[in-house]
Amino acid sequence: MLDLKRIRNNSNEIKEALNNRGEKFDVTVIDEVLKLDEERRNILVKVEVLKSKRNKVSSEVPKLKKEGKDVSNIVAEMKNLSEEIKGFDVTLAKIDEKIQYIMLRIPNIPNPQVPDGETDEDNIEIRNWLEPTKFDFEPKAHWDIGTNLNILDFERAGKVTGSRFTFYKGLGARLERAVISYFLDTHTEKHDYTEILPPYMVNRTSMIGTGQLPKFEEDAFKISEDDYFLIPTAEVPVTNLYRDEILKGDELPLKHVAYSACFRSEAGSAGRDTRGLVRQHQFNKVELVKFTKPEQSYEELEKLTNDAETVLKELGIPYRVVRICKGDLGFTAALKYDLEVWMPSYNRYVEISSCSNFEDFQARRANIRYKEDAKAKPQYVHTLNGSGVAIGRTVAAILENYQSEDGSVTIPEVLRPYMGGREVIK
């Protein structure tokens, strides 16, 4: 959520920034917010005048009573003033509700570093690691490799649940588990993140706090009876861990890593990478989340991105880092990098991680603040997160980049201790 004071003082700048985003945003709502804000402030002035008058009249009552004078008219005036104030309070509550409704639907403002552009084709490659994998045979897609090795079963998952679900079997299940353990060990032991094992369901307030709601409700799986939601990412519960709290400045940055299953309806993605493990309704992911002081956040974003890159380097998977343009930025981020791995069967790079700085956008929605010391005024933290990284897509990238002509798959060296010393799946 944006700072209302910022909108008030820089409305034209805010409108221009929102106009440059990819999704067509109706900037006239900024004028609507400003109109409501002005109305609210005018009413507050009137309320203060009425309260001052009521207090003045009220202070006269004891003196007049002591003098034996009739105070019925003054009491009646006080009652009228109180009723008038109460009426204004009702009006203010309605205005606040309207302002909140609009503010929750205004996207974040892109950081000046974000490049211009309208679609993902305008994203800018920052760096890459390893050349795309080449083969002297026609490489197979990971869903064919996994099916042939009997380690992935899409057909039976379709029978049991539906499309875009998967059974991992035998060494496939062990490979998935190995990747999860390797990622968690790397981020906790080498990168100094504190591990969190979060709930897989959250309430509506939590989804609003991180920006999934109200805009993306159609993409969420809702448990309707209790107004709970299956988490689309561990970012939601881990960020909301500190909702409505004031953190200590000397504790920042706070760094958490969380493994979780993730659940997404992927509304509107029909026909896009729907085969295999790339776009599933349920998938596993290791998430990195940081809470920082504002002046630290962009330095910490670079570190977080590097932490996510480390596991891809150690796995030996070719990847690149792209800076996301304004048109592809998404609702909540101020600046975002995507890590994309090379997928031979696609003959292109596929996103495996998004690393974002939300600045104070989520912190305002979730009311997460910090104080430098006991006497200091609370300030909003900056929140950051990134996949560290998506598990299913990592497994897909391993199967495709490490495949052999005979259909076997070499296990990356760093995973072999987690695979009982095995070197090959065949």
Swiss-Prot record:
Pfam families: Seryl_tRNA_N, tRNA-synt_2b. GO terms for biological process: selenocysteine biosynthetic process; seryl-tRNA aminoacylation. InterPro entries: aa-tRNA-synt_IIb, aa-tRNA-synth_II, aa-tRNA-synth_II/BPL/LPL, Ser-tRNA-ligase_type_1, Ser-tRNA-synth_1_N, SerRS_1_N_sf, SerRS_core, tRNA-bd_arm. Its EC number is 6.1.1.11. One of its GO terms (molecular function) is ATP binding. ATP binds at residues 264-266, 351-354. Disulfide bonds: none annotated. It is found in: Cytoplasm. Catalyzes the attachment of serine to tRNA(Ser). Is also able to aminoacylate tRNA(Sec) with serine, to form the misacylated tRNA L-seryl-tRNA(Sec), which will be further converted into selenocysteinyl-tRNA(Sec). L-serine binds at residues 233-235, 287, 387. Pathway: Aminoacyl-tRNA biosynthesis; selenocysteinyl-tRNA(Sec) biosynthesis; L-seryl-tRNA(Sec) from L-serine and tRNA(Sec): step 1/1. The lineage of its organism: Bacteria, Bacillati, Bacillota, Clostridia, Eubacteriales. Consists of two distinct domains, a catalytic core and a N-terminal extension that is involved in tRNA binding. Belongs to the class-II aminoacyl-tRNA synthetase family. Type-1 seryl-tRNA synthetase subfamily. It comes from Clostridium botulinum (strain Kyoto / Type A2). Keywords: Aminoacyl-tRNA synthetase, ATP-binding, Cytoplasm, Ligase, Nucleotide-binding, Protein biosynthesis. Transmembrane segments: none annotated. Homodimer. The tRNA molecule binds across the dimer. This is Serine--tRNA ligase. It catalyses: tRNA(Ser) + L-serine + ATP = L-seryl-tRNA(Ser) + AMP + diphosphate + H(+); tRNA(Sec) + L-serine + ATP = L-seryl-tRNA(Sec) + AMP + diphosphate + H(+). GO terms for cellular component: cytoplasm.
